[in-house]
């Protein structure tokens, strides 16, 4: 029997405040609800999903490093680190795990400083502006990608 594919969902700073933080941009669902919904989908897709959120760059980098040869695909919402973190980008490149970048809001409809991402050019794909559904689409893509 083949081993379950392992997918890691990484969420960056302030996403622990989903549901109360700027719901016009980020929606009204909590991160816990989003993660529970994704766990149900992961079971349907017969993949193993682990979830991790941190407000510190160091903790996110450590989690990426720990994923080396342990995780098959990463779904990441780097949040504000999208626009600032060369270190997170380098960590993803170092472990060479394919990933999709997800943003709840359409970053291109927001402030100009949010228009640049340190991740998009090295990601398998980018999903933005679709709210919590974006995570579902990312998981669906990850499953499809891993079947190749």
Swiss-Prot record:
Pathway: Metabolic intermediate biosynthesis; chorismate biosynthesis; chorismate from D-erythrose 4-phosphate and phosphoenolpyruvate: step 3/7. It is an enzyme of class 4 (lyase). The record marks 21 as: Transition state stabilizer. Transmembrane segments: none annotated. Its EC number is 4.2.1.10. Keywords: Amino-acid biosynthesis, Aromatic amino acid biosynthesis, Lyase. Gene3D superfamilies: Dehydroquinase, class II. The keyword Amino-acid biosynthesis applies. Belongs to the type-II 3-dehydroquinase family. This is 3-dehydroquinate dehydratase. It comes from Pasteurella multocida (strain Pm70).
